[in-house]
A protein has these predicted regions:
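PLP-dependent aminotransferase class I/II
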Residues: 200-280, 284-287
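A general structural signal for well-ordered alpha-helical segments in protein cores
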Residues: 5, 38-42, 61-65, 89, ...
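Short beta-strand/loop segment that forms part of the nucleotide-sugar
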Residues: 177-182
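Conserved core of the PLP fold type I
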Residues: 53-172, 183-198, 202
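Conserved PLP-binding active-site segment of the aspartate aminotransferase-like
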Residues: 29, 223, 295-301, 312-315
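Conserved PLP-binding catalytic core of the aspartate aminotransferase-like
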Residues: 269, 281-310
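Short aromatic/hydrophobic contact patches that present stacked aromatics
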Residues: 27, 148, 293-295
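N-terminal "arm"/small-domain region of PLP-dependent enzymes with the aminotransferase-like
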Residues: 1-55, 143
Length: 315
């Protein structure tokens, strides 16, 4: 074996959800929003000066950072923007998880966590959920190199109450705690209010689910200015121009249309609750979803059989 072959960093890659090449598919596997982005995005597209694409975008994403900060009542220096929440989370792993102690995350959770840990050679321990698929806060009170968990969790769709989230943060004030809130807009209370209370917490969110902009790749997080500066320092060490002009422009329009955002989220939540009722009548059981999907099982029909029948019906 050649020396370079021995030195290749080998990881088990994250497998993204299937993206069907055919049209007219009812696509459920990656939890995308069924509604289009705000009409203001379309208006922004019509106003866009194509000749501006010859210019590099703003490396600090100033206008989008300001729009996000203003919407959520934060300061600009408390906001970091990346190319989707995956990019933000990856930067967080690289920036803050550098201890020889293991980071902690749930054993049933977002599968990208272990991929990043392997890629960056970060030791980790997966913490089991309880019998009802809930995160057990006490499992995160032990010595560690950092903590990350989704809330609501994926794929369980279960929300952990904010007081329990705060308990985890309280017991880990010497390390960074990342709360991954990709689905928070569909239920529960954000941990954002804890950003001004604790110096070690980062709250990560995305435009992909509730804002109908998965194709634009916009993610962001909130944290104290020292953490945000560290993230920007690492980002600029890789690529100063991570966010393109189109995403910046469309992202600003999305943030500024609160009425449309709340309308779409409300419709999705109503559909979810109706689906729960219908699924129960059909013999399905599931945890109480606070996301835009339902983690369901059937007492007599296997998941494989359901999957195959849905595929046959172009789902």
């Amino acid at each position: 074996m050649k020396t370079w072959e021995k030195n290749i960093r080998r990881v088990e890659p994250y497998v993204p959800g299937e993206q069907p090449k055919v049209k007219d598919v009812v696509k459920l596997n990656t939890n995308e929003n069924p509604y289009p982005p705000t009409p203001k995005v379309h208006e922004a597209a019509e106003r866009m000066n194509i000749s501006d694409l010859r210019l590099y975008p703003d490396p600090e994403v100033t206008d989008l950072v300001h729009a996000i900060a203003a919407y959520y009542g934060m300061n600009d220096n408390q906001v970091f923007v990346g190319v989707g929440s995956d990019d933000v989370l990856s930067m967080c792993f690289l920036t803050f998880f550098n201890s020889d102690k293991p980071i902690l995350f749930p054993n049933i959770s977002y599968s990208f966590y272990s991929v990043w840990a392997d890629l960056y050679r970060i030791p980790y321990e997966k913490q089991p959920l309880d019998k009802d698929f809930n995160i057990i806060p006490e499992d995160y009170y032990k010595e560690n190199g950092g903590v990350v968990f989704p809330n609501p969790n994926a794929p369980t769709a279960l929300y952990m109450e904010l007081d329990k989230v705060e308990d985890i943060i309280k017991h880990n004030q010497d390390v960074v705690v990342i709360v991954d809130e990709a689905y928070i807009d569909f239920g529960g209370k954000s941990a954002m209010e804890l950003v001004n209370k604790y110096e070690n917490v980062l709250v990560v969110q995305t435009f992909s689910k509730s804002r109908s902009m998965a194709g634009m790749r916009i993610g962001y997080c909130f944290g104290n200015p020292e953490l945000i500066k560290a993230l920007n320092d690492v980002k600029f060490s890789f690529n100063s121009y991570t966010m393109n002009r189109t995403s910046i422009s469309y992202g600003i329009e999305s943030v500024n249309d609160k009425e449309y955002f709340e309308e779409c989220v409300g419709k999705i939540v109503k559909t979810r609750e109706n689906a729960k009722e219908r699924l129960s009548q059909l013999g399905f059981s599931f945890p109480d979803s606070k996301a835009n999907f339902i983690f369901a099982t059937h007492k007599s029909v296997s998941a494989k059989e359901i999957f195959e029948k849905l595929i046959c019906q172009i789902f």
